[in-house]
Amino acid sequence: LEQNQYVVTQQYTFQAGPVTKRADLVMLINGIPIVLIEAKTPVRSSQSWLDGALQVHDDYERNIPELFVPNAFSIATEGKEFRYGSIRMPVEFWGPWRLEDEAALPSIEEIGNAVNSMLRPNVVLDLLANFTSYATHKGKQRIKIIARYQQYEGTNKVVERVVAGHPKKGLIWHFQGSGKSLLMLFAARKLRLH
């Protein structure tokens, strides 16, 4: 973890053949672009995080796919909401990132907490190594799946309890449709590698 070099750069220019694109922010680990961040202005009510996500999904992913070979995930924000998703993930599946015990805060504080939590080097590397999978969307296109925040938190708590030998090691309760199957996939994978 400490031996890696982490840099976040503004206006990252990437060229693929004749096409050149400029992303707002990119997190590089050892010079490799791992996280792309598209930040829209918070003062224009006509723009939202969705505009940034669509720019990533419909423009960057299609026109400079080489940039997304090492990509762990992308982020879109306009300073009021924060959403993340992985390559080819439809934007309607992009989700927020927040700690489960985090109370709702004013927008800019919530964005700051999400950035400070999700973009810590240990979290980015953990997401990259243990919390990604692949699936086929609508029977055609392969997409990269990345854990939602509750799957990330839940998996790490399950692993922590199993390693510590607590009773009811893997017991966790979630609502229907919350991604329990993926949580178990991530937990099994992480436990196997532990």
What kind of feature is each model-predicted range?
Residues L1-H194:
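ATP-dependent helicase/translocase motor core
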